[in-house]
Amino acid sequence: GVASSDATNMQATAVLDGDEYVINGEKWWTSGAGDPRCKILVFMAVTNPEAAKHQRHSMMLVPMESEGIEIQKMMHVFGYDDAPHGHAHIKFNNVRIPKDNLLLGEGRGFEIAQGRLGPGRIHHCMRTIGVGERAIELMCKRGIDPSKTPFGKNIASLGANFDYIA
């Protein structure tokens, strides 16, 4: 496999054979694949290895029940499995899909991925900032809670707690 987050460095292939693409390769961190409601995968593969670096890949829809799809294992992130949604390591062995399952056209996979990843990254950053702000809010609230007064003082005034909040 390829140990990289460089989307242009993938090895999974989709080769046109008549009216079908034949998919071979592996995908790690396939989000949502563990969820029993997941019926279709959005799959990016090399369709033209001779094309320019950012035009080699195509995006296609792959039904989960397709013959040749094998979930190898579910992945953990910092010990958390995100069940049942999860992230999977999947092998694709001669998986055949109709050529009509191609999205936007051959060579446009990288373009599609970048169009989705940019806004997705902003979304995750905003969510994380929001969670951080909420944690600080709860910490401050607890620090001055009149019902929490060990040694007769509020928690914020004890030890380094005020510094931690700052």
Residue ranges and their predicted role:
Residues 14, 23-25, 60, 92, ...:
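Buried hydrophobic positions in well-ordered alpha/beta secondary-structure cores of metabolic enzymes
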Residues 1-16:
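A gly/ser-rich beta-alpha-beta helix-loop segment of oxidoreductase catalytic cores
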Residues 1-5, 28-35, 119-123:
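Glycine-rich phosphate/pyrophosphate-binding beta-alpha loops
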Residues 24-72:
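A short core secondary-structure module
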Residues 5-8, 33-38, 52-56, 82-84, ...:
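Short glycine/proline-enriched turns and hinge-like loops at secondary-structure junctions
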